[in-house]
Amino acid sequence: MMSKHIFQKEPVLSIATCLAIISAFFVPPDAEYLGYIDFRTLAILFSLMAVMAGLRGQSVFDRLGHALLSHTRTTLQLTVVLVGLCFFSSMLITNDVSLLTFVPFTFVVLNRLNASVRRKLLLPIVCMQTIAANLGSMLTPLGNPQNLYLYGKSGMDMSSFVLLMLPYSIISLVLLAIWAVWLCREGSDIVVTHSAVNSEPDKKLIALYGILFVACLLVVLRVLPYGAAFAAILVCAFFADRPTLGRVDYSLILTFVALFIFIGNLGRIEAFSGWLQNILAGHEVLVSVLASQVTSNVPAAILLSGFTDNFRALIIGTDLGGLGTLIASMASLISYRQIANEVPAEKGHYFAMFTISNVVFLAILMGAWALT
């Protein structure tokens, strides 16, 4: 029963761990295992998650949302703010944190509207927020875990990375804007009532986390050594805000470790390594998009990066590959679970809307890629 519960709660970690264990039968553990682990990626990942958890704990993002909503007067303005928050914030705070923060916030806001408006807007807006977070996050190395990993692996500079993904981000933003206008084509004035965020923020903690976030940026830009920033964040959180350490997603870090071991072992199995390299050669984008549909894009990025050095194609493929199935990006499950918990009768409708809209977005963006 316990193993079933663990699998249901952490399916990706469970599968990654099983794959690592199975691969160890073919390549018995030895000193080379340590060389599989990308400690820089793990340290940056932990650092970012700890800083974001600290800022969320101080309701920084909720306050930002309330401030922006204070200026909304129509359903279109409301939709643009709620979706825009996810699109733009995900570039810096990751797609996961964006959805964890702003999807529950959306329920709170829409519950203050009349029933007919809420019914019309709820599912489309949450669906748009999910797509917005996944597509907004692809513009920067900080936006999602696979970008962070592939950016470090590729040795690209920040400007090259942003320019690589900028066309897809612009197209995504235009598509979301068109959807928002269409959704609110029978626009009406609304009144959004605002409630104060419960607790007063600790301004010293917010300033501290702001400084630590800048340190994370400097590490990503390869200005600061990752070890120093990791140690500083760990020590600061431990002594200044210990509960934050309990809100870090350690399962994601363990998933990375398990996948590093699995991929490292596969690379030492010559027959499999040669086969996968042949499949990938010249088809990196398509293979990574397809792999993401089944494994989700983070495992796909880590797996395929061991068998090609065309990291630009992998970045495009795994970012676009976050569209499609519900598990193509694990961040999408955050929104689905929220829908299932808050309006369980609508989860089937949401799933259908999510799948159709994701396929449409994926088809258009893949068409844009094919034309480049």
Predicted regions and their residues:
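Flexible interhelical linker loops that connect adjacent transmembrane helices
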Residues: 2, 66, 182-210, 242-246
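Structural signal for alpha-helical transmembrane segments and their membrane-water exit/capping regions
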Residues: 3-32, 42-59, 181-186, 215-243, ...
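Interfacial loop-to-helix junctions that mark the boundaries of transmembrane helices
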Residues: 3-9, 30-41, 156-168, 198-202, ...
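Transmembrane helical segments that form the transport core of multi-pass membrane transport proteins
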Residues: 36, 58, 62-65, 211-309
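Membrane-interfacial loop-to-helix junctions in multi-pass transporters
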Residues: 39-41, 70-83, 113-125, 203-207, ...
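Hydrophobic transmembrane alpha-helices that form the pore/transport pathway of multi-pass ion
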Residues: 88-138, 302-316, 344-349, 369
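Membrane-core helix-loop-helix motifs of multi-pass transport proteins
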Residues: 117-184, 190-195, 336-367
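C-terminal transmembrane helix pair
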Residues: 162-173, 286-372
